[in-house]
C-alpha cells in the first residue's frame, strides 16, 4: 500500500517546481530559449498569441515604437530616424525642419549624396556600424535608414539623402550601409519603396512608370538590399505607383519584394501612408506607423493629410473586424506578425533587450565622420592649379558667404541630426591655414531663413561691398555658398537649380575683385553655375558634410588631404538639360516617367547633351594613367563570368586616390539601351609613381536588361564593350568580348 505525501512535503514540492520553472522559462516557453533556431521560436510564440494579440502587432504604440506585449514578454521596437546619424524621435519634433529640441545628440555624418560621392563601400559600411552603435547607446534598436531612392531630377528636396542617380552605385552603398547596421544587431529599414523621387504632392502623386524602368532604375538598390544584405525591414513610400498606394501595392510588396526577391522581413509604413485595412495587409504591408495617441494628435492637425486619413487603419479593432467580416484572411495577419517577430528574434530583442548607456560621439566615431567628410568632397574645377593653397606663400585669405560661418551639417526634415559639436568652414580654414595666414571673414549676403536674412536693400549692398573689399585686399578669396536645411528639405522641392538669395551675384562681384576666387558649394544637389563658372579659379563641391565638414574643407583647400570624391550625379548646365525636364512635377496628381531608363548620365548620353560636369567626375592634385586592359575570356558562355583587368599608375608628384570606373556598352540589342551603364568601380590609393592592377568580375547581370515582354532579365548573345575611365565622359580604355549562347 502506497503512503500519501504529507501536506508540508506536497507544498515544498510545488514551491520547488515553481522555482525550477522560473529558473528555466525556456522549458515551458521555448521561444525564450536563445539556443533554438529563430523559426522555431517564432512558431512557438505565434502559437501562444490570441487573435487580438496578433492584430495588435500590426500598428505602433506611439510615434516611434511598436506595440509591446507584457503577457508574453514581447518588447517594443524602438525607432530612430536616419540615415545621416541618430535623429531625434521625441513626438512631432521628429518631422520638423528645425534641429531636434529633445536632448538627443549623435554623430552627424555627411548626407547620403556625399557618401555616394566617396565611392567608398567600406567607409559606408563603417558609417552604418557607427550609427548602429549610437542607436543602441541612445536606447533604440531600429534606424529608419538608408534612403536609396534615385535622384531622378535636381529639384527633389531629398536628393541629399540618397546616393545619387545610378542604380548600381546606389545598390553598392545600400548593401554596405545595411551590413554595417545589422552587424550591430540594429534593425535598418531601407526606404522609400518605391520611386519616392519628388516631394511635391508626395502624399497624393501617382507615378506612372513602366515595368522595365522600375526594374532597371528604381528597384535595383532595394533588390540588392534584400538579396545581398538580407535587410530586415523595408519602408514603403507615400506616393502611388501605377495607380496604387505603395502601402497597398501588391505588385511592389507581394509579387516583387516577397515572392520574386524572397524578402523575409517586415514592411513598415512611412508615417501616415496607409489608406485601408484589408487591402494594406493583404498586399504585404505589416507594421503601420505611427500609432496610439501620437497618430491621433498628428493627423488631427489641419492640412496634415490632403487625401483622407493616412493612419489608424491597422489598429487591432479594425484588423479583427476585417477578418471577422471576411475581407481579410487570418493567414495574412499571421504572416505579418510572424515577419515582425522573426526580425525581433534575429536582432536579439528578446535576448538582449536592454539598450542605452553606451557612448556617443567618441573620438573613434569622430574620426570616421571626419574621414567621411573628407572623402565626400569633389574638386570640380581647378584652373591653373589654383588649389591646393600654399600656406607658406600666401599671407591673407578672405572667407566669404552665407555658409562660411554656419555649419550646415545636413538637409532638412527627418534626417537632420543634432550633433554635439560642428565645425564651420571658416573655423576649418583658419585651422588649416595656420597662424601665419591672416583669415578675414565677411558674410556677403544673408540666406533666407537665417537670422540676418530680413535686411533692407541698403544693408544687402553694404554686406556685398564689405565682402568685395575684403576679397580685393586678400591673396585668395574663398566663397562658401549653397543651400540650407530650411531651403532644401523633406516636404518640398527646390523651386529651381539656382543658388538662392543673391549668391550668384556675390560670386560674380568677388571674382571680379580677386582672380584667385575659390567657390565651395554646400548643397545636396546640382546648382546652376553658368553665370560665374568661367570667372573663378576653382570650384569645390562639399555637399552637406556633417559635423566635420569644416575640417574636411580646410584640409582639402590647403592640401593636407588630396580630394578623392567623384560625382554620383550629373551636373547639368541648366535645369532644362535634365532628362526629367518636362516630366516633372506632373499634372492633375499624375507624373509620367516618360524618360524611361534614361535617367541622369544615361539621358545625357542618349540625347548627346554636354553636362556641366559628368557623372563620375572629380579632379585630384595628382594625375593617373591607365593602360594594359585585359578581358578574359574573349568569348563567354551564358551564366559564366568575365574578368576585366587594367593597370593604373600615379604619374603625379603626390599621393592620391583614383576611382576607376567600369561601364558596359551593349554593341547591338533588340531593345533601345543606354550607351553605357556603370557596372563596377574601385578606389585605388597610389603613391607617386606607384602602379597597380585593378580587377573587375562581370556576371550575366551586368550584361542584362529587363524584358517587359518576358517579365524577366535578359542577356542577349553578341558583342559587348568594356569602357574603363575616370568618369562617364573620360573613358581611357576600351575592349570587347562576346557573350555566346
Name each region found by the language model.
Residues 1-9:
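Bacterial N-terminal signal peptides that target proteins for export
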Residues 9-18:
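Bacterial N-terminal signal peptides
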Residues 18-705, 712-714, 719-729:
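Glycoside hydrolase catalytic-domain context in secreted enzymes
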Residues 730-741:
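Short beta-strand elements
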